[in-house]
Amino acid sequence: MLAKRIIPCLDVKDGQVVKGVKFNELKLAGDPVELAQKYDREGADELVFLDITASIEDRGTMLEVVEKTAKNVFIPFTVGGGIKTVDDMRRLLQAGADKVSINSAAVKNPELISQGSDRFGSQCIVVAIDTKKTEEGYQVFINGGTKNTGIPLMDWVKEVKYRGAGEILLTSIDHDGGKNGYDNDIINQVARVSNIPVIASGGAGTIEDFYNVFHKGQASGALAASVFHFEEISVKELKNYLSEKGVEVRL
C-alpha cells in the first residue's frame, strides 16, 4: 500500500506566492522558497508550484524560483503553468523540478503528453484536469476553468492515460475554494477509470475532508492551498490525524 501524499500548492506570480499567505514567522510571507522550506520541514510529501504570471516574458523568474527551490528543498516538486512545448518542460526539469504539469496545452495538443512522456518518462508528466458538472455531465474546462471544451471528462481521462501521463491532478471547479470537502465521487471514478495516481484538488476545509478524499475518493494525494497558507491546518497535525484513522502516511 503506497503512502497517501499531502501536497501544498503555491500559486506564483512574478516570483511571489499569491492567494493569501499568512505566516507570522516568515520574513517574506510570499517568498516561494521560504514557504517551500517551511512545508518541507513540516513533513509535506510534495509541493506543486503553479506559475500564474500573465506575460510570457516573465517566465525566467519562475526558472530562478525552481533553481533555488531545488537547492533548498528535499521533497519532490511539480511545476505547472504556461508549459506549451517539450522545450518548456526540459527547461523546468533541468532547473530542478521533479515533474511538470500541463493543462490547457495538453487539451489543445494531446500529442504534447506523448512527447513529454517519451522524452522524460511518464513519472515526470502530470496532466492537470479542471472539471465541472454540466447538464451533459462532467466536462473538461480550460483557460483557468473559464472555457468549456465540451469534452466529456472520462473520455479525456482515458486519453491522458493512453498517452502516457504518470498522474492526474484533478480539480473540481465547483468545489474549489468552497472549503466544503473534495468532490469524492468524481475523484473515485477518475481513479478507477485511469488506474494511475490521482491527486485531488479543490475543496479542502477540514482535516476530515482529507480523510474522506483518501477513504471515499481513493485519491493518491490531496492538494490544498489556503488551509495550509493560513495555518488553519498544519501538515504535521493532519498526518498524525490520518495515521490515527488508519490511513497510510509518511510520518
UniProtKB/Swiss-Prot annotation:
Disulfide bridge positions per record: none
Coiled-coil annotated spans: none
Reactions listed under catalytic activity: 5-[(5-phospho-1-deoxy-D-ribulos-1-ylimino)methylamino]-1-(5-phospho-beta-D-ribosyl)imidazole-4-carboxamide + L-glutamine = D-erythro-1-(imidazol-4-yl)glycerol 3-phosphate + 5-amino-1-(5-phospho-beta-D-ribosyl)imidazole-4-carboxamide + L-glutamate + H(+)
Domain of life: Bacteria
GO molecular function: imidazoleglycerol-phosphate synthase activity; lyase activity
Assembly information from the UniProt record: Heterodimer of HisH and HisF.
Any single GO CC term annotated in Swiss-Prot or TrEMBL for this entry: cytoplasm
Family that this chain belongs to: Belongs to the HisA/HisF family.
GO biological process per UniProt: L-histidine biosynthetic process
Keyword Membrane set for record: no
InterPro entries found in the cross-reference section: Aldolase_TIM, His_biosynth, HisF, IGPS_HisA/HisF, RibuloseP-bd_barrel
Alphabetical UniProt keywords: Amino-acid biosynthesis, Cytoplasm, Histidine biosynthesis, Lyase
Enzyme Commission number: 4.3.2.10
Name of this chain's protein: Imidazole glycerol phosphate synthase subunit HisF
PANTHER family: IMIDAZOLE GLYCEROL PHOSPHATE SYNTHASE HISHF, IMIDAZOLE GLYCEROL PHOSPHATE SYNTHASE SUBUNIT HISF/H IGP SYNTHASE SUBUNIT HISF/H
Primary subcellular site in the record, as a coarse category: cytoplasm
Role of this protein: IGPS catalyzes the conversion of PRFAR and glutamine to IGP, AICAR and glutamate. The HisF subunit catalyzes the cyclization activity that produces IGP and AICAR from PRFAR using the ammonia provided by the HisH subunit.
Catalytic-site annotation from UniProt: 11, 130
Pathway: Amino-acid biosynthesis; L-histidine biosynthesis; L-histidine from 5-phospho-alpha-D-ribose 1-diphosphate: step 5/9
Annotated localization: Cytoplasm
